[in-house]
Amino acid sequence: MVSQLLAGGLVSFVNFCVHAVMTGLIVIITRRIAGATDDLHVFMRITALLTITVIALTVAHVLEIALWAGFMKLAGITASETGVFEFAFENYVALGYGDVVAGGGWRLIGPIMALNGLLLIGWSVAIIFEVMKMAEFQVGLQEKRSR
């Protein structure tokens, strides 16, 4: 059990680092785009910011799921009836039907993945909300300037 917790904690930590890097990139990119899109209509500007944010976060989540699958492959952990990527995906999004469990004494790895996924998905929701707030604030400034 301790080895499962340590291994799961290590992969979770790496995933948190991936998400932190992606968060930093999103902040940099959205600030540059916000400045470069002053001439666009408000709707197009917000749409561009949100689209880029959601695409970047989706890429981060797929990479994080792939890291879980890679860990399972390296550790020789099998998931009955599915591949490791499908198993990792199901658990990361906390869907975890429960019909497939990790073999070889790694039964805790699924719940650890689910907790990791829930935290990172919640983090993504916070980023999306913050981008929307930032866009709304900038739109308010733009409207004040045009009056």
Please provide the spans of the model-predicted regions.
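Alpha-helical transmembrane segments of polytopic integral membrane proteins
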Residues: 19-27, 64-68, 121-125
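Outer-pore turret/helix-boundary of cation channels
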Residues: 59-87
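Short, highly charged, low-complexity non-transmembrane loops/tails of multi-pass membrane proteins
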Residues: 137-147
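Helix-boundary and loop/linker segments of multi-pass membrane transporters
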Residues: 1, 40-47, 99-103
